[in-house]
Regions:
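Conserved N-terminal phosphate-binding loop of PLP-dependent enzymes in the Aspartate aminotransferase
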Residues: 1-200
Length: 200
């Protein structure tokens, strides 16, 4: 990944553009609405598919199962992994819009043979994870985790949904679980209480 000036790139030679739904590398700073509007304009004017990498931010960490749904943008193609089973099983998905579907045609063969076949434990782990998601409690989890960190003298430097970047003496990062309960909060509280200043 790199920053670049659009004026130095010949967009006629670009096959696709890949972005994350929310950047981790830039300290969880969200992309602006203007950024997403410009991407959409580039897609329309230059016929460039926009691929959203939702591997890290998907799975509910931002408050929606699909991380890109927290933006105003709809990708041409998006991919997810890891988080779709809560990290319990290596499973990934890739989906695409009607425009890509039309370009592939009716007879496009998705058969990967033995290189990729659906495996029952992977599907079961994803279904179980989906059952655990409770977005009704999302705001509460976010608020309580924030309060626990601040109560232990941590500064919340940034947060994207349930992903927190904090600092006391040193940076400390945490992804809160989507099914956090009182037990989780107690463990987090005890963990932060037991940390020495030299540890953080």
């Amino acid at each position: 990944p790199r920053d670049f000036d659009l004026h130095t790139i010949d967009l006629e030679t670009v096959a696709c553009i890949i972005v994350e739904s929310h950047t981790y590398a830039k300290k969880l700073k969200p992309y602006t609405e203007e950024f997403w509007r410009n991407l959409d304009m580039i897609r329309i004017v230059y016929d460039i598919p926009i691929i959203v990498d939702d591997i890290f931010m998907g799975g509910g960490k931002l408050g929606k199962f699909f991380g890109w749904e927290t933006t105003s943008f709809r990708p041409s193609i998006f991919t997810m992994g890891k988080a779709i089973t809560g990290g319990y099983y290596p499973l990934s998905i890739t989906c695409y819009d009607d425009y890509i579907d039309k370009a592939l045609g009716d007879n496009f063969n998705w058969d990967h043979g033995y290189t990729y076949s659906f495996y029952q434990p992977g599907i079961i782990s994803m279904l179980y994870y989906l059952e655990q998601l409770n977005f009704d409690k999302f705001d509460t989890i976010q608020r309580v985790v924030r309060e626990i960190f601040e109560g232990h003298g941590f500064e919340i430097q940034a947060n994207a949904g349930l992903i927190f970047s904090t600092k006391r003496e040193k940076p400390f990062h945490l992804i809160a679980p989507l099914n956090a309960t009182g037990e989780y909060y107690n463990v987090l509280n005890r963990t932060l209480t037991n940390l020495k200043e030299s540890d953080i």
